[in-house]
Regions:
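Extracytosolic ligand-binding ectodomains
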Residues: 1-437
Length: 437
């Protein structure tokens, strides 16, 4: 496995951080709702002849920026992510490590300004921002300053050397669950995907993953967000009209026959909605939330028997209540290992009296990684070669590694939806040796 992102790298001592910094001090009993704004440009000296020398503990600080939407429409998200980052700071960082939050205001322009302020504050690494447009705006600033970025986005279009994405990629999720499905008898797969760039990306990834394990995507249909659009997509992918017509034709052929065999056959047909199977034995449903519930409800309406067709999904299925949808029971999906994050979830709950945001594990792991690499003998190791170590890093989100092109890999487990929640049917691998690039 990779380097484990746990345990303090050196004893933590209490100190007063500079304005705008979150220093490596023990957690306070309460956390301010609004973090202080970093002071990038200190006031000038009282007289030009005075030479100001910072205290040794400030001069030796390893500064890392975290770019988050701390104001604007996404402020709640930004503050929730910052809470997880602070937990990593308290757990792992030593007293020389300082985390400086910069507000992107949830806009691309704000992200570029935040990146410029971070560079001016002499940071050595940037964590964040969250959204792909913010990453695209901030990256030129950090690259020009030769500072590497660990962003939260999963939009591979903004990845490049020096801009590493920690977001969970749909490509890796689909590759994992399709590989598992192929090893357990699934041969022909249909795909229900949302309209738009994400859906197109998911379909490309599914085709690539299926080809790699010798099976095929035989049908795909896009669905829009409304119930009628979802129903239409399910109707088309299931060949419902053709199968319905085949049933009516069978009934008509038998109705004129008076023998007992024909009558028994007609009785059997009378309880069916369609005649003949759907053209696949696995069905990818690239949906989450209300859309997933809506798709699940439509499957039985158009005679897709999920006892015969294995549903395959993404990590977004890892929500409470998935097992309440009968059509989803038995479905498989790939997700980060649940066991890795249990202690993190408990610690977060104890500190903040709430559950962590979905990006919380990534925030914790990236700040923990920064703290550990920042405390290496001989100085911080934030170079691209170290960040893209082949062995990777073991964090609360499981084993992960960055690739030289800026993308990332995660070792995922496969779970099955059950009435009582999802259960692990194949654990995540403990090393990257058996995982393809």
């Amino acid at each position: 496995g990779g380097a484990v992102l746990t345990g303090p790298s050196a004893p933590t001592r209490v100190e007063s951080p500079l304005p705008g910094e979150i220093g490596a001090s023990p957690p306070a009993l309460s956390v301010p709702a609004t973090p202080p704004v970093p002071v990038v440009n200190p006031p000038p000296a009282a007289a030009p002849s005075v030479q100001l020398t910072p205290p040794p503990e400030i001069a030796n600080q390893i500064r890392v920026a975290i770019l988050l939407p701390l104001s604007g429409p996404q402020a709640a998200l930004g503050r929730a992510v910052l809470d997880s980052a602070m937990l990593a700071l308290f757990d792992v960082a030593n007293s020389d490590f300082a985390l400086l939050p910069f507000d992107t205001a949830g806009t691309a322009e704000g992200a570029a300004i935040a990146a410029e302020n971070a560079v001016a504050a002499n940071v050595k690494l940037v964590v964040g921002p969250v959204f792909s447009d913010a990453v695209a705006a901030a990256a030129p600033v950090t690259l020009r300053a030769e500072i590497n970025m660990l962003a939260f986005s999963n939009n591979r279009g903004v990845a490049e050397p020096g801009v590493f994405l920690s977001g969970l990629l749909p490509e890796s999720q689909l590759a994992r669950v399709i590989d598992y499905a192929a090893r357990h008898g699934v041969r022909r797969i249909g795909a229900l995907i949302p309209t738009g760039p994400f859906g197109a990306r998911a379909l490309d990834a599914a085709r690539l993953a299926a080809g790699a394990v010798g099976i095929e995507i035989v049908r795909s249909r896009e669905f829009g967000p409304s119930s009628p659009e979802i129903a239409a997509a399910v109707r088309l992918i299931s060949n419902y009209d053709e199968r319905r017509a085949a049933l009516l034709a069978q009934k008509k052929a038998l109705q004129g026959l008076e023998n007992e065999v024909s009558k028994r056959a007609l009785n059997r047909l009378s309880i069916l909605d369609t005649f003949g199977p759907v053209p696949f034995d696995g069905l990818i449903v690239a949906a989450s939330g209300a859309e997933l519930v809506n798709v699940a409800a439509q499957l039985s309406n158009y005679d897709i028997d999920t006892k015969r067709v294995r549903l395959l999904g993404l990590s977004s299925w890892a929500v409470e209540g998935a097992g309440r949808e009968p059509a989803l029971i038995g479905g498989w999906f790939a997700a980060p290992p649940a066991a890795s994050s249990r202690e993190f979830n408990r610690n977060f709950q104890a500190m903040y009296e709430t559950t962590p945001h979905g990006l919380g594990r990534a925030a914790y792991d990236l700040v923990a990684l920064a703290a550990i690499l920042g405390s290496q003998e001989g100085g911080p190791k934030f170079d691209r070669a170290t960040l893209s170590s082949e062995t990777g890093f073991a964090g609360v989100g499981g084993l992960f590694r960055f690739l030289p092109d800026g993308l990332s890999q995660r070792s995922l487990e496969v779970r099955e939806v059950t009435p009582g929640g999802a259960k692990t049917v194949e654990p995540a691998r403990s090393t990257f040796e058996s995982l393809p690039n």
